[in-house]
Amino acid sequence: MDMDMGAMVGNVVPEIVLLVGGVVVLLFALFAPRRWQSGAAAIAASAAVLSAVLVTRRLVVTEQMLTFTDSYAIDHLTNWAVLFVLVATVAVIALSVAWFRQDPRHGEYYTLLLFSALGAIVLAGASDLIQLVLGLLLSSVTGYVLTAYHRRSRSSSEAGIKYFLLGALPNTGMLIGVAYLFGLAGASTYPDLGDALGPTSPALAVGAALVLVGLAFKLGAVPVHAWVPDVAQGAPAPVAAFVTAAPKVGGLIALARFVAVLPPDAIGWRPVVAILAAATMTLGNLAALWQDDLRRLLGWSAVSQTGYGLMAVVALQRSDLAVTSLLFFLAAYVLGNVAAFGVVTALRGRTDRADYQGLGRTRPLLAAVLAIGFLSFIGIPPLAGFPAKLLLFGAAIEAGYTWLAVLAVVNTVISVFYYARFLAPMYFTDPDGEGRPALLSRWASAATIACGIGVVAVGIAAEPLMRDFATALLLPG
């Protein structure tokens, strides 16, 4: 038994490093003098980088399996998800250093960031209803605090309260749904759940629907999406970058694992998810058309991107491209989203469309990064969003949802208009005369540019990445 426990612990060393790193940062923040508080960022970044190195090794040398009595999946899907979340975490730490420099006691912020990342990772690997709830709550509770972290900012506090209040009902409903399913199956692990769930019943339908709503909230999908634009606009900009990216990674993979164990003939989950995808991408794109604030536009863009990601879930078990398209979409989205919010962070205080007039002349590198992020969201080659969109459309068509792929193409065309409303003034309008906009810090600019380069690199390296993503299993299915 001791050897078995040792082996199981060894399987999750990257997650343990993140947990220990969060505790160390918290202790440092409690006892270190105020002038040393920024050192918490270095500790947090070191923990995230070490965890990323370890998970890369796990991706190469460890077989895909379930561990901890089938409650946690160590497959390539989890490993890639961990890498995506950690890339976002390291980038957001770099964005946060100067943003919170004036806060005399901000070391615990990095603890919350690491714990929130851990929550998203647990969500991605959860193969048990209890693990699913644990990941959801850890990611959500830390997200509420991070969103409202600027205590003296009315917009930050308001966004945090809205995030909490709008999440209370879906999260509570998910707990009830988990209780329903546990009562029906007499087990909480997904392998046992799949074996025990029989013919459809009202309780099974209600339980599955409540869990679906809880995960939809985490993703920012219709009809529980209203928090996303408010958080994107009101939270500290580095937090907005993180909250609109990392939980989406964990939430989409958690949803994929959950629906894969539901009885395929007893529960009509596929058309429900397809309708959610259609409604989410359409509402997100239409709402973004009228936005003049860049942060709010990115919030609605995040909603629409969730709709595209749900297409991969719809295609599960019907298309060989489903898992590959899901991973490629997440890679493209995380890099593009953090890059776009990185520009907002580097140009602190400039969020109105008029503020970006002539940015291509005054800050050409940052303007290029924002353009790369937007063009990737649209799906312009050779950026990462192009192969991601192709894979998603192909998966939906193979799964028999051609209408959803056509609607996604229409929505992609719609998105061109609101992205162009920001891109055109950056390059075809003279600066507003206020001079060159000041940068928050070199760290923020460097992280932003690195993410922009990542968007290009992933698009260029699409073929080898697709081969690697194709080896990922969706355990326990």
Which residues does each PLM region occupy?
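Alpha-helical transmembrane segments of multi-pass membrane proteins predominantly involved
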Residues: 1-477
